[in-house]
A protein has these predicted regions:
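Short glycine/threonine-rich loop/turn motifs
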Residues: 28, 38, 52-195
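Glycine-rich phosphate/diphosphate-binding loop of Rossmann-like nucleotide-binding domains
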Residues: 5-62, 66
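Short catalytic/metal-binding and nucleic-acid-binding patches
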Residues: 199
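Helix-enriched interaction subdomains in cytosolic or periplasmic regions
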Residues: 1-2
Length: 199
């Protein structure tokens, strides 16, 4: 009977962990109050509707050390879901995906769009998202634009509900976001440009 009680408690703790979420906004502009954060309230509401207990994290700085520190802190506090929005673009100062990879070296980081190297302000070769897992905790690095977060949210929620592995969740998020980029007519969506580069 004691063992049953212990396994029930373990299950309850795991259930509680998986339902505790923290959402981190990222970026210098938010910290300075130059732009309003619409993503965090939106994600908080969507997750709470589905029974999550959501904490709003501090704004992450535009450096990978700060991202790593805040992710590490959230992991040690037992959050089952850690979401960052912003900081996944192609400019050099975007560090969310790198932070997730430091925590989980096998994180899934598919591209949502590819650029010609060295065009405009883009230093990297495209925009990636990241999904990593450490113990019972899942980390998801989403883009910053609010329309992209709105596009990703239903996929994220379904993936959590159906307990997809990190590769599946990352690929399906990337597919939805690549489609959105294609409709915006920006860049070349990664999923559809293999072997059929435009001449």
């Amino acid at each position: 009977a004691v063992l049953d009680r212990v396994s029930n408690m373990t299950r309850e703790i795991q259930e509680k962990v998986s339902r505790r979420a923290i959402v981190f906004p990222t970026g210098f502009e938010l910290k300075q109050g130059m732009i309003q954060d619409t993503n965090t309230p939106f994600l908080k509401h969507e997750l709470e509707e589905r029974g999550y207990y959501v904490t709003v994290g501090e704004v992450m700085e535009d450096n990978v050390e700060d991202v790593v520190e805040k992710l590490d802190d959230a992991l040690s506090q037992g959050f089952g879901l850690i979401v960052t929005t912003g900081g996944v673009g192609a400019e050099d100062k975007d560090h969310s995906v790198e932070g997730v990879c430091r925590m989980d070296p096998t994180a899934a980081t598919p591209y949502i769009v590819k650029f010609q190297q060295g065009t405009g302000r883009h230093v990297k070769d495209g925009v990636r998202i990241g999904v990593g897992v450490v113990g019972p905790s899942r980390m998801v690095a989403l883009p910053g634009p609010h329309d992209e977060v709105m596009c990703a949210a239903p996929v994220l929620l379904r993936g959590l509900e159906e307990n997809w592995d990190k590769e599946t969740l990352a690929d399906r998020l990337a597919a939805a976001l690549a489609d959105k980029w294609r409709r915006k007519g920006m860049g070349q969506p990664h999923h559809h440009n293999r072997g059929q580069e435009k001449g």
